Amino acid sequence: MTNMMGAGPFITIPLLMSAMAGPQAMLGWIVALVIVVCDGMVWSELGAAMPGSGGSFHYLRQAFGPERFGRLMGFLFVWQFILSGPLEIASGYIGFANYAGYIWKGIARSDVVILITIVGLINIALLYRRIESIATITISLWAGTLLTVLGVIAAGAMNFNPRIAFDFPPGAFDFSLGFFLGLGAATRVGIYDYLGYYDVCYIGDEVKDPGRVIPRSIVISTAAVALIYMAINLAIVGTIPWREFVPASAHPESNFIVSTMMERLYGPRVATIFTLLILWTAFGSVFALLLGYSRIPFAAAESGYFFKTFGRLHPTRRFPYVSLIVIGAISIVAGFFSLGTVIDALIVTRILVQFMGQVIGVMLLRRRAPDMLRPYRMWLYPVPALVALLGWIFVFATTDIRVILFGIGVLAMGGVAFLLWSRSTQRWPFALVPR
């Protein structure tokens, strides 16, 4: 749940409202919840049945065949993750820079680029060593996030105005093509806010009684975050009229909407304190993400399923420095784009291989390995899996065509890279593999 509660709730509300130009955009957030709950059942079945570390990398290999198409799917997962992981980190950098704009009055675009670069380099430098435990980091991150969240919710509850919160524009629910395109955009923002609901699956071998704990962890964390995010959404839109920060691109103050809210209610001094808390939360979040994400390409390379370069350890400090530098550098560059573009690219890049791939994978395993031990079996199978699949297709299809082409292009390049790598190592499909 900690990874689900970084800077997300403080930076996405203007984007969410801008997607459909009004509070009806919260419908997209509900659609995202339905998709995530159904997809969470997919993760739960896979995680409970195969509770080793690796998550998607492990599940995709087993579902599609570890020495054949599973190698391709595992490779493509890591390939897209080298981009989608940094995109997620970059969203935190962007959020950090946006809220810094409340304190740094008149911050220019060039200043934002410099600030993101400095924060990104500091993040890499702090992680350029062996770190045995992130318990202290996680606790401090969670404490800062919880304090800020509770403060925002309490302030919103005491000043909530339903007329402001539910001020729907004319034709808010006309169900036109534009309505569904906007719904798709709002859903992508909602899914971004939920990202991390599956993180327990990446440490499955460290979980006691995974068949019981993993499904419960996914359900409880998703439900808790849904309630918290809904409360934050209502706290803000019930205090500040949405027309004052929609569209987000035309209202610079939308970059630090929580700071604006606190300033109106309690003055600039309290707003500055909350801004500093959000900056702390944002940095703690990107620190934890870069630490965890830099280990995924390393683990894949070490097990022989990705380029060996990413499996290199620092000669004296014994940490995956190549993977850290690559993920860290891409994160900085990705931070130069707009938050909306970064979120769209992040979600679309993960959909095809990771999310849709796993839905298909759980169905393949049901057919190919009916006797596999499944401590948790998806309720009402295959309905949740099909709902998740249709949801991912909807989110993908309603994305800007340029982002779709970008996502497909990334996977196409990954396919070419896989073939070149397999040819150089004489592995499948260039070497016969026993069935």
Give a label for each model feature.
Residues 13, 58-66, 101-106, 217, ...:
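TM-loop-TM module centered on a large, flexible mid-protein loop between adjacent transmembrane helices
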Residues 309-319, 355-404, 427-434:
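C-terminal membrane-solvent junction of multi-pass transporters and transport-like membrane proteins
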Residues 26, 107-111, 139-275:
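Helix-loop-helix junctions that connect adjacent transmembrane segments
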Residues 97, 111-162, 177, 195, ...:
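Membrane-interface loop-to-helix entry segments
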Residues 15, 37-120, 125-128, 278-299, ...:
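Hydrophobic transmembrane alpha-helices that form the core helical bundles
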Residues 148-155, 297, 346-374, 410-430:
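Hydrophobic alpha-helical segments of multi-pass membrane transport proteins
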Residues 1, 26, 66-82, 115-119, ...:
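Select transmembrane alpha-helical segments in multipass membrane proteins
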Residues 15-21, 25, 91-112, 131-142, ...:
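Transmembrane helix-loop boundary segments of multi-pass membrane transporters
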